Amino acid sequence: MPIGSITVGTPGTAVAVATSGNAITAVSFRARTDNTGAVYVGDSGVSSSNGYRLEPGDELTLSFRETIDLRRFFVDADTADDAVDFAGVAA
């Protein structure tokens, strides 16, 4: 089960959730409660205008019929050093 945290150092710059392949069937993202702004989950082009918005403490859970590579997910944030925790269900 891939588990980790992603910190966005520079707002407007998407950060990869994983750098090596992890086949998953589900994944949960949770914005840290101590974040000062929203974070966004999406693909490599994620931004505040097209990502799934998570306010501090919000959680997003996605399930898939087929396996998907965790490297497809990226995170961006409104505020530098805000973070997202994630946990994937390995295939």
Regions found by a protein language model. Give the residues of each.
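Short proline/glycine-enriched turn/loop motifs at strand-loop junctions of beta-rich domains
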Residues: 22-24, 31-37, 81
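Short, solvent-exposed S/T- and G/P-enriched segments that are highly enriched in secreted/extracellular
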Residues: 8-16, 49-66
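Short, surface-exposed beta-strand/strand-loop-strand elements in extracellular ectodomains
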Residues: 32-50, 85-87
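Exposed low-complexity, polar/acidic, P/S/T/G-rich flexible segments that act as propeptides
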Residues: 81-91
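Surface-exposed ligand/attachment interfaces on beta-rich extracellular proteins
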Residues: 2-23, 80
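Beta-strand-rich, repetitive solenoid scaffolds
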Residues: 30, 41-42, 54, 63-65, ...
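Noncatalytic modules at the cell exterior or secretory-pathway interfaces
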Residues: 25-27, 65-82
